[in-house]
Amino acid sequence: MNEKYAALRANVGMLGQLLGKSIKDHQGQAFLDKIETIRQLAKSSRKGNEADRERLLETLRTLSDDELLPVARAFSQFLNLANVAEQFHTISRRCEEQVCTPDPLEQMFAKLKASNLSQEAIIQAVRELDIDLVLTAHPTEVTRRTLIHKHVQLNDCLEALELSDLLPRERDKILNRIEQLVNQAWHTNEIREQRPTPVDEAKWGFAVVENSLWPAIPEFMRNLDERLQQHLGVRLPLDAAPVKFTSWMGGDRDGNPFVTAKVTAEVLELGRWMAVSLFYKDIKELTSELSMSDCTDAVRERVGDHPEPYRALVRELREALRETQEYLTAKVQGQVSESRDLITTTAQLREPLELCYHSMHACGMGNIADGMLLDVLRKLACFGIHLVKLDIRQDGERHGQVFSELTRYLGMGDYAEWSEDDKQAFLLNELNSRRPLIPTDWEPSDETRETIDTCRVIAQHDPDAFGIYIISMAGAPSDVLAVQLLLKEAGCKFRMPVAPLFETQEDLMAGTAVMERLLSVDWYRGYIQGRQYVMIGYSDSAKDAGMMAAGWAQYAAMESLVALAEASNLRLTLFHGRGGTVGRGGAPAHQAILSQPPGSLRGGLRVTEQGEMIRFKFGLPKVAIHSLNLYTSAVLEGNLLPPPKPKESWRAVMEQLATVSCDHYRSIVRGHPDFVPYFRAATPEMELGKLPLGSRPAKRKPNGGVESLRAIPWIFAWTQNRLMLPAWLGAHKGLEHAITDGQKSVLEEMSRQWPFFRTRLEMLEMVFLKADLWLAEYYDTRLVPQELWNLGKQLRQELADAIQIVLQLRPQGDLLDDQPWIKESINLRNPYTDPLNVLQVELLGRSRSHTETLHPELDQALMVTIAGIAAGMRNTG
């Protein structure tokens, strides 16, 4: 056992014992003994004891129907508690340096000062920081909000236990509260009864802001400001917002028919209501703080001879916020309310607060001004009165459909059949025209009306409420111009940024040519005014070509887009659509940022944060502060001390790796006749549809095959059976080919000197430690028809070969030896995840052999194993 993580193991042990007590009180000692037997057998099986492995299988196979659900719940709940303990450990006082970078910003400023950079260059880079974290609903965020809330409270209790001067009765009180929370969790159904609506998802996002990001931002800003003062002698401006938040929840309608224009409008109002409510609380508290009487003439002019000038100013704000809150409450509830003197812009709040701030500093009260008042100003700069900006995303085909219907109605032929040049000519002509294009008597289809209504919602709201408009499957300049024309026709008076999303390997490779053609359009250059966004899709490109080929396609696309932006004198912001898993572009934030091409961060960083990753990275204020520090230090390093440009020899090897790995990946996923039936038999893909996860359907087309399956359930299914196929398939063949071709020394050099390549290998190592050949084989022998066994055997052999190939490229040691914390984290969970896998196989077998409807408890048990394995793997889709 690794003594280094003794504090973590002690907390895991304590929570496990309390869960055991809850189980015993509810199910009896005999049942708890059975759970403990299964746990010990799983640990022994992990160590290679074949006899205990057989006993484990026998014990789980012979469970009665009414035992399956509580056994699944016991292991699933333990894994959730282990995650709570681990998340706490990363912010604990006892956290080891290998786990928690003590202060990433402090280390970064020291590193920058030690470099040859001028002080002015560093200050400029800090002032130009532009990090936009985009919160997205996640179809595989399997943990219910009610359980997340209990887990947050558990975290608070673990923190309180660390205080060294606790009295015995205080300690007992905390331990009793922990016991209550564990007991509450055990008696709470972990699977939600109904699929969440898009509005439910948006409320979940707002709850993350309220509970975690709202308190985290002022602390993060204070830390950054102090480091800047300490190292460079300057402070951040009052309106500095190096980090901002955007949301897709209620705005992302690509493939989700439940996100309508009405839903988007409702989510926008809810966001405003939440922001006003939070600022009202803060301003109310601030009123009690600002009792001072000294002030500048500028404040006196506003409040007259009031004895408490700051309170007088802030009370006016408080009343305006209260009125706005009442108005928005009525509006959200569908009631008509009189429009009064409402807060409609961030400036209405900022101006009087800045007046107070400058007055206090002028009157020798800078220390007071830099307290809660500065915190409110920092929140205003970050969140504004909309809380988060809302992105809109729609499939490019839907915009084309509007113009197809319209041109047919107008007798102009079918827009869909026109050449790209004809489409552009039509769109540009209409963009330059002053007359409306859409006739008032036109009756479009429901889908087309919905697309137009969405643009009208955008036109009716404040520009500050929105981020950007993203077009999925964008392949031509007309895709972008079509959206701009729709916005014009809807009466939109502001220039909403429109970003094409390049997501397949082919789209990524063609992306720069598309942008080049678009930028050659004079009207478009005038519209964007020197600022362009492009979204890079990680999930679909990996599903399309495999992780290695997709990674290189993403890198090459970014590199050529950056070169185009420089040549065109544009500020380009690359928007990274990454997931939490390796198969969807996931990697620790710092590594992912530093493995991007040099120059790709000049226009800022914009990246999606999804479902379960939002919870792991931003679910607690202290965890959120640490994550924000990591992002900031990584972006500063990426801009000021960028990684080297790849050598020509490295590029040649990567081209070869990408070609070989993509060919092999596609030969299996697209070319093997048995692949689709094998995938459906060997994973719970068909059963995943039953799980009431996100609001979005799992498939783009209900009757489609693997190609229509969304990237998230595709990854989720392979994670469940522990083959982890999308995260490695193809990569090993590329590496093997390069080694056989005499390029091993080049690969080793790439691993040492090039963050992009090193990150790929590290991600493979993590995946290999989570994968399990024995369990993958067990799924096959129990669930897969015998005529498909050969494919399963081939894939497992390829996984075993892949592990050996990656080990060859390690300087020494075993998988993840140089990342002991991640290794410890995976090893801690594996013995608790393994029984859930065996149980899942048992439940899938019973479910598939029942022609009639399965007993609800067995259905529930299957859902619990899916959620539990997701918790054990720590990243789902």
Swiss-Prot record:
It is an enzyme of class 4 (lyase). GO terms for molecular function: magnesium ion binding; phosphoenolpyruvate carboxylase activity. It comes from the Bacteria. It catalyses: oxaloacetate + phosphate = phosphoenolpyruvate + hydrogencarbonate. Its cofactor is Mg(2+). It holds the Pfam family PEPcase. Its EC number is 4.1.1.31. NCBIfam families: PRK00009.1. This is Phosphoenolpyruvate carboxylase.
